[in-house]
Amino acid sequence: MKTLADAFHHTLKDIYYAENALTKAMPKMISAADGDVKSAFEDHLKETREHVKILKKVFATIDKPAEGEKCDAIEGLIKETEGIIQEASGKALGACLIGAAQAVEHYEIARYGTLRQWAKELKNDEAHDLLSQILDMEKAANAKLTGIAVAAA
């Protein structure tokens, strides 16, 4: 990567891969969870599918095809979550699933915050607005998970 535009495109492909990977991983989390945690995961799966649609629009703003590039970070977080599902049970399972989901949210918040700022620097107002929408949704999802964790404590 030699330019900010290159970095933007690379990171956009990274988060696109991550969101698509999450749409495949989240059903396992939903199956393992119950109560408010399950409901929050179901809601977030719907939002994640919406994020993929919005990201396609961001790709269009830079005249690039919507395609992912393997994201080792999200693969690691998904693998960790799969281990939690196999090893944890009872109240610990719910708490660990919330922690795993928040690790994903924090990764996404960092990526979307970076992309949004880069879109601003690249004077791509449409991408900035679209990425702001997703960033706001990710922050809200994280806050919802925090609320569930606090209520369960």
Feature-to-residue mapping (PLM):
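Amphipathic alpha-helical hairpins
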Residues: 1-153
